């Protein structure tokens, strides 16, 4: 087959037909080039215009016959309006984002992402569109001289139907594909920025000797680029082939043969050559990807990968390049034979060398001697996994695991026994709500937070929560977005000490807030930014305007509320009409334009969840799901942990975050961490001010290469941790989600010997939560703890291990390990991090241990006859017994379990109160009203332990609610509550004809009313004067709307 006679050689133009002069040299690349001259149609009959797919064609009459009717003016108007509305919606989203980031001071983050995405969209979109357009142009310009005659009848009909809209299609298809390619490429903006700003890791991989950052930054970028180029070549090649086929340059003969014109052959040959070159590059990159594989029991390149897959990938890469050269030879010679043979050889090589050979090596060489051959690669997996997850410096201690008890055994364990957490943050949320909510427009989270504070010179573990705003969606727009805008105050209880009646011992409570910890005068109590804040609030007013925001009750028992006006800089201004219109479109709220409550001084607060705010200003970070509030330097600050992560670290085992971070407390909660990682660092500590929403990002792990790369991208968004105040450092703790990831991996990777790791006979599991019926992991617990060998106690995050749970095997629920992470970062100095922060300590018990695990300890509790009898008594009167968190403590050479037992009476206004404490050491069980008594039962009558100061009054009889609160206000509330309950139960007994029961309830009613009267007298006369409200607060107008609680 010949390429024609226009200019000689493969790029010469084909002969013209009828009326042409010389042939095929008008373009710089001859007939094949996109700018080469096209053959003219026969004569000047107007069937086709001059060369190029966009030239005019045919007579005016012919064009007139093919032209469709014009759309009506109404249709054009509707289309124009729809387009304008769509563009305005897009504009408002971008414009409001600019306002939001600008107000926070993070415009660098916004514009960097926008410019990166925009550049990728343009580059990738134009690249795809240009390639497809050139393919279409080339194929159309070099169609046969009589395309209609060359094509079959069916294709001729398609040509005629396409002709009126041919120019639109030939332009539209490249544009649509370009937009799609550009939109897809935008998702790789962070990959590109990381590649361009990477810094060396400083450690080489064990197989190729390349810096580890090559695998985390360079290899993903190269994969992205090669994948994009392959897509471009494939899409443009297929598009060009379709046009060639449509216009007869590629024809399938009736006998089964295929005829291709020289120009089409050149086009297809060069496309295939480029495609194979890119495949060769892809094969070469596959060599490096073997170090990131996650197949089998171990991660990374194993024996078969190193000795079969990597060499064969190199062979396939060279073969692909050679076959690409054969396709170039096809273009030059016009012969397909060699290129087709080369393609067959490549396919066979891929099947035999790329697939069969590694399979044979694995099955017949590796499997019979797997332990020996894989040993060095397992060592790589162990070392690199421990490096990637920060497990390379775990302090391991062999622990005796004693089970025998004797008097005085806990005499030297004051640091642990004095800080035992008896308040369960998962159970007492309802207690917080009943005793400290005060208004239906306030709420507390389901699970409370754990932190520590210094009170009277001593550091105490505490249970705490912010009193957040809670407004029902059924409320009016004014109520939801301008009246109920914020919560009020922190509520803090001692984690170890218990008040009378089994209720929390408050360190900060009431409204106005007061207590040993602080008062309203010591910090700004208003919570405008929290977990439960409305989607947006409009706040602020001109100077002198009346306050409209519902602030707080004047006192805890007052029916009158104060009003308040936000005075900070917390959100973009909506003081002008354009901004109001933009936000009205963004939130679908025309009230922002129409309401008189929006004025020239108004600000709009939105994206108010602390984790979401950090996620927006630091899109390169994975944000922890458990931000917690702390009073820091006179402000409530949400402390948020954030991580740099990667799934490209060589030889490291990957984890699905959504699976390993789920436990009995986080199950079913959103948002949960998502994605797969095999590298993680707690590189950033962030704070979000609860009053004005300001965000600060601190580079916590400034040695992390990933964080250093992102600091190059965003040089002004991160601050050094040396700028953290001493007060903030005192409340930093070890991050919970990262600890969950680490404890999961350490269950296998505490084994560092390759042979033992291969046998997998010492793998551990995180125990199931013994207080739950379903099989779900026990959560880690924060507590102040002094580990064996530790110089002084530290606020730590802890978890335990039992032997690995395997399907079909009998579970042995004994304790194999205990893990703690030191969380004290403060030193009392600004910007100075404690040296021991983050140290992981692992206690390993003997494999022959009989120390029960948490599940077995719970079973021992449940099967104890004395415990069962006492619990049955507590269940009388329709009361519900609730098991609190199972605390595990390494003391006296063994393991001590402590579990608080709560009782909750039936009824919607009751709450759990601590009634008993369960304790076990070895197989001995103690069950008493106080921790001290329970310990003494276990340790032969005198444990020698120092426990928290007892502040419990005599507990009520079983079935009764506690009636001895710690403050006058609580006394009144509890007395009225019990009076209401006695009245209700008395009526029920009367209806049943139970006169004796009715008489008992009448006695309860009279006693409760006496206590209520006494408390009311105390409030009216001898009670301490209420603190004055802040100067800016004033009584709320009586006409202020009342909220409906959201339940």
Curated annotation (Swiss-Prot):
InterPro entries: UPF0182
Record family assignment: Belongs to the UPF0182 family.
Region (Disordered): 1-66, 544-568, 941-965, 1007-1047
Membrane association type: Multi-pass membrane protein
Keyword Membrane (UniProt): yes
The keyword Cell membrane belongs to this UniProt entry's keyword annotation: yes
Compartments, as annotated in UniProt: Cell membrane
Record protein name field: UPF0182 protein Mlut_14990
Biased composition (Gly residues): 1-27, 49-59
PANTHER family: UPF0182 PROTEIN SLL1060
Biased composition (Polar residues): 555-565
Organism annotation: Micrococcus luteus (strain ATCC 4698 / DSM 20030 / JCM 1464 / CCM 169 / CCUG 5858 / IAM 1056 / NBRC 3333 / NCIMB 9278 / NCTC 2665 / VKM Ac-2230) (Micrococcus lysodeikticus)
Keywords: Cell membrane, Membrane, Transmembrane, Transmembrane helix
Gene Ontology CC, one term: extracellular region
Segments passing through the bilayer: 71-91, 114-134, 168-188, 214-234, 266-286, 314-334, 341-361
Chief place where the protein resides: membrane
């Amino acid at each position: 087959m010949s390429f024609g006679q226009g200019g000689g050689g493969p790029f010469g133009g084909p002969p013209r037909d009828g009326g042409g002069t010389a042939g095929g040299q008008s373009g710089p690349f001859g007939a094949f080039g996109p700018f080469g001259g096209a053959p003219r149609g026969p004569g000047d009959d107007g069937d086709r215009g001059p060369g190029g797919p966009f030239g005019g064609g045919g007579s005016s009459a012919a064009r007139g016959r093919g032209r469709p009717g014009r759309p009506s003016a109404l249709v054009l108007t509707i289309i124009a309006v729809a387009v304008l509305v769509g563009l305005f919606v897009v504009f408002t989203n971008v414009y409001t984002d600019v306002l939001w980031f600008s107000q926070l001071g993070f415009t660098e983050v916004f514009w960097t992402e926008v410019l990166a995405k925009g550049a990728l969209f343009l580059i990738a979109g134009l690249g795809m569109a240009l390639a497809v357009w050139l393919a279409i142009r080339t194929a159309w310009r070099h169609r046969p001289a009589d395309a209609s005659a060359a094509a079959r009848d069916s294709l001729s009909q398609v040509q005629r139907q396409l002709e009126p809209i041919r120019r639109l299609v030939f332009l539209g298809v490249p544009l649509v594909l370009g937009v799609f390619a550009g939109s897809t490429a935008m998702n790789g903006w962070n990959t590109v920025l990381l590649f361009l700003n990477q810094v060396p890791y400083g450690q080489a991989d064990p197989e190729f000797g390349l810096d580890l950052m090559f695998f985390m930054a360079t290899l993903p970028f190269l994969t992205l680029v090669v994948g994009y180029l392959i897509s471009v070549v494939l899409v443009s090649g297929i598009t060009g082939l379709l046009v060639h086929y449509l216009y007869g340059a590629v024809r399938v003969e009736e006998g089964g043969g295929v005829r291709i014109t020289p120009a089409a052959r050149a086009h297809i040959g060069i496309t295939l050559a480029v495609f194979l070159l890119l495949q060769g590059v892809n094969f070469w990159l596959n060599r490096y990807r073997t170090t990131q594989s996650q197949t089998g029991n171990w991660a990374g390149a194993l024996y078969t990968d190193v000795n079969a897959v990597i060499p064969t990938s190199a062979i396939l890469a060279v073969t692909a390049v050679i076959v690409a050269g054969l396709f170039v030879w096809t273009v030059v010679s016009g012969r397909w034979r060699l290129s087709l043979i080369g393609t067959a050889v490549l396919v066979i090589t891929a099947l035999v060398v790329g697939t069969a050979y590694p399979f044979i090596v694995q099955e017949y060489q590796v499997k019979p001697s797997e332990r020996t051959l894989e040993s060095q690669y397992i060592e790589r997996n162990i070392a690199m996994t421990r490096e990637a997850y920060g497990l390379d410096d775990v302090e391991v201690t062999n622990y005796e695991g004693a089970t025998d008890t004797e008097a005085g055994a806990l005499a030297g364990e004051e640091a642990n026994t004095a800080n035992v957490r008896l308040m369960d943050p998962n159970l007492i949320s309802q207690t917080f709500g009943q005793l400290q909510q005060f208004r239906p427009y306030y709420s507390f989270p389901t699970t409370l937070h754990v932190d520590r504070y210094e009170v009277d010179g001593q550091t105490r573990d505490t249970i705490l929560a912010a009193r957040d705003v809670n407004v029902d969606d059924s409320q009016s727009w004014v109520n939801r977005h301008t009246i109920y805008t914020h919560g009020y105050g922190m509520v803090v209880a001692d984690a170890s000490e218990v008040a009378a009646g089994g209720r929390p011992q408050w360190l900060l409570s009431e409204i106005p807030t007061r207590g040993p910890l602080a008062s309203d005068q010591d910090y700004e109590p208003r919570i405008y930014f929290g977990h439960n804040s409305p989607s947006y609030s409009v706040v602020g007013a001109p100077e002198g305007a009346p306050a409209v925001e519902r602030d707080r009750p004047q006192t805890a028992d007052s029916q009158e509320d104060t009003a308040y006006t936000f005075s900070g800089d917390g959100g973009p201004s909506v003081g002008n009409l354009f901004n109001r219109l933009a936000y009205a479109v963004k939130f679908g709220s025309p009230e922002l334009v129409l309401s008189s409550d929006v004025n020239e001084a108004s600000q709009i607060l939105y994206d108010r969840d602390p984790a979401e705010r950090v996620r927006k200003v630091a899109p390169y970070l994975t944000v922890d799901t458990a931000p917690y509030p702390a009073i820091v330097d006179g402000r409530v600050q949400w402390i948020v942990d954030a991580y740099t992560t990667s799934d490209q670290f060589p030889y490291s085992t990957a984890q699905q975050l959504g699976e390993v971070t789920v436990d009995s407390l986080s199950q079913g909660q959103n948002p949960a961490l998502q994605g797969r990682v095999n590298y993680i660092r707690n590189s950033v500590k962030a704070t979000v001010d609860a009053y004005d929403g300001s965000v600060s990002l601190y580079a916590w792990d400034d040695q992390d290469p990933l964080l250093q790369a992102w600091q190059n991208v965003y040089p002004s968004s991160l601050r050094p941790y040396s700028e953290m105040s001493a007060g903030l450092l005192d409340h930093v703790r070890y991050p919970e989600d990262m600890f969950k990831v680490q404890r999961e991996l350490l269950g296998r990777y505490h084994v560092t010997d390759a042979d033992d790791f291969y046998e997998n006979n010492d793998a551990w599991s995180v125990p199931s939560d013994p207080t739950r019926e379903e099989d779900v992991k026990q959560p880690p617990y924060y507590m102040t703890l002094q580990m064996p060998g530790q110089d002084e106690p530290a606020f730590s995050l802890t978890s335990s291990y039992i032997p690995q749970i395997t399907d079909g095997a009998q579970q042995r629920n004994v304790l194999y390990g205990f893990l703690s992470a030191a969380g004290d970062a403060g030193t009392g100095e600004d910007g100075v991090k404690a040296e021991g922060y983050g140290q992981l300590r692992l206690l390993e018990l003997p494999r022959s241990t009989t120390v029960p695990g948490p599940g077995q300890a719970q079973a021992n509790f449940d099967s104890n006859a004395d415990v069962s009898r006492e619990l049955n008594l507590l269940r009388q009167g329709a009361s519900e017994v609730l098991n609190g968190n199972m605390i595990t403590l390494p003391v006296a050479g063994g393991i001590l379990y402590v579990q608080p037992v709560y009782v909750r009476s039936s009824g919607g206004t009751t709450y759990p109160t601590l009634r008993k404490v369960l304790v076990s050491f070895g197989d001995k069980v103690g069950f008493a009203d106080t921790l001290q008594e329970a310990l003494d039962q276990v340790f032969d009558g005198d444990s020698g332990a120092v426990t928290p100061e007892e502040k419990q009054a005599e507990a009520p009889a079983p079935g009764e609610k506690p009636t001895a609160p710690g403050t006058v206000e609580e006394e009144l509330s509890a007395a009225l509550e019990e009076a209401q309950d006695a009245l209700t139960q008395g009526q029920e007994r009367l209806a049943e004809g139970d006169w004796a029961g009715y008489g008992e309830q009448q006695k309860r009613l009279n006693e409760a009313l006496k206590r209520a009267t006494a408390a009311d007298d105390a409030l009216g006369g001898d009670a301490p004067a209420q603190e004055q409200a802040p100067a800016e607060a004033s009584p709320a107008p009586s006409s202020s709307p009342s909220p409906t609680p959201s339940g």
